[in-house]
Amino acid sequence: MASLKALRGRITSVKSTQKITSAMKMVAASKLRRAQQAAEAARPYAELMQRMLAALADNVAGSPSAPRILVGTGQDKVHLLVVISADRGLAGAFNTNVGRAARTLANRLESEGKTVKILTVGRKARDYLRRDLETRLLPETSLAGKKVLAFADALALSQQITARLDAGEFDVCTLVYNHFNSVISQTPGETQLIPAQVPQAAPADAGASSNGAKAVYEFEPDEETLLAKLLPQNLAIQIYRAILESAAGEHAARMTAMDNATRNAGDMIKRLSLTYNRTRQANITRELIEIISGAEAL
């Protein structure tokens, strides 16, 4: 049985840890509100951009001069995975889940005979993937280590991806990140960036009238010029949206993890306090028995 001094030390240590986890929970909750608002504000803009591209892409996709971001290279040999994670831990399985999803996707692609390259945003994804896929990791992780990622950072990353596409370094680019569903639910998912997966235009966007006739629009400048401008912007927007979703998911996961840690610390303090009191009572009882036995011996 542990001594009273050791038990007091453990109780003090756990109480100190409980204060830290409680403070981290409150900080994560504060950051979550801001991150959630930013993620929700970005969704309508990103969705509207997709609708706009859908209205333009129908007439351009089959053109030999269509932008490469839209149609890709025409091959499916080399895949670039852009994996977004956090720089910090203490967020439950948040980073492990996205790292596992990226590893599963990479292994599946390689089993199909494809070459995989990985660009990570966030230290935790890089640390996780280095164990099994170190040779596939690209050296640049320019966004890792930043406390706050702005749209300019997403734009810089999209420009880096576009430059690699123009250099012929990959054929398909896929974004892997944690979708923010709710405070208690963040699920890893994939979004293909290149070739751009533009949704089918809705009838109103495509210019279809109520009698089935399709309206013809004239664009100034032409569709290809507009797409050449909009597609890089859309690439940056989709990356930024994923960064915001991942940030909101990270803070939610950390808040939940710290809440669980605080509760567990409270339970441990109760158990240790009970053990301490029982040990103290046992020591008092033993001392009383020794005193009584000594008195009887006299």
Swiss-Prot record:
Matching entries from InterPro entries are given as: ATP_synth_F1_ATPase_gsu, ATP_synth_F1_gsu, ATP_synth_F1_gsu_CS
Q: Does the keyword Glycosyltransferase apply?
A: no
Q: Which domain of life is it from?
A: Bacteria
Its placement in the membrane is given as: Peripheral membrane protein
Tell me where in or outside the cell this protein is found.
Cell inner membrane
- Tell me if Membrane is a UniProt keyword of this record: yes
Which SUPFAM superfamilies does this one have?
ATP synthase (F1-ATPase), gamma subunit
In this record, what's one Pfam family? ATP-synt
UniProt lists the family membership as follows: Belongs to the ATPase gamma chain family.
Could you describe the subunit structure of this protein? Answer: F-type ATPases have 2 components, CF(1) - the catalytic core - and CF(0) - the membrane proton channel. CF(1) has five subunits: alpha(3), beta(3), gamma(1), delta(1), epsilon(1). CF(0) has three main subunits: a, b and c.
The name on file for this protein is ATP synthase gamma chain
